[in-house]
């Protein structure tokens, strides 16, 4: 097991390949880590505003027990360069608003750019409650002077709905796209 346990979606293992964790150059990181003057890695996201309900099917096996994954291991990277800060996240299992709250606790303001999934993709149509969460998340993001690039696990219906609120503040991200972050 890894330092935080083994991760599963149902019965399917979705954690890091054990061959990778065995490599001598791989260093497990817990908590926050300043890598250098430009790179800062953080975890410790504890907020639960609009915590994605799709997380409920994700589990961790730790000390012989299978538990709901709390995503305390989820890490985000902040790249600081030329007076700008870019926040990079993966699927945002903790919820993008909670990740931004933690970022603001650490840095005292908003990032210039966020590159992240929003973990809103669904196989079934959204019900009214989920649509309200998408809208409220977009309204909250619109209050910040940040450009958001998302794709991946956000899902096209959620992206399109959020873009009606965020406009050019929300931009699509696809494999192979090159971002010129200097021009935002």
Task: For every predicted segment, state its role.
Residues 70-76, 80-175:
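Cap/insert and terminal regions of metallo-dependent hydrolase folds
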């Amino acid at each position: 097991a890894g330092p935080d346990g083994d991760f599963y979606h149902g019965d399917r293992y979705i954690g890091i390949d054990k061959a990778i964790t065995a490599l001598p150059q791989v260093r497990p990181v817990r908590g926050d880590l300043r890598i250098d003057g430009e790179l800062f890695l953080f975890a410790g996201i504890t907020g639960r505003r609009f915590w994605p309900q799709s997380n409920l099917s994700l589990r961790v096996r730790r000390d012989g027990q299978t538990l709901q994954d709390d995503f305390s291991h989820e890490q985000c990277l902040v790249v600081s360069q030329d007076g700008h800060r870019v926040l990079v996240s993966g699927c945002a299992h903790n919820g993008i608003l909670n990740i931004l709250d933690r970022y603001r606790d650490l840095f005292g303001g908003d990032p210039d750019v966020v590159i992240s999934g929003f973990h809103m993709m669904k196989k079934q149509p959204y019900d009214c409650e989920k649509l309200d969460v998408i809208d409220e998340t977009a309204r909250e993001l619109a209050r910040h002077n940040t450009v958001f690039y998302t794709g991946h696990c956000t899902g096209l219906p959620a992206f399109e709905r959020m873009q009606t609120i965020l406009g050019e503040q929300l931009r699509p991200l696809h494999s192979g796209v090159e971002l010129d972050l200097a021009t935002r």
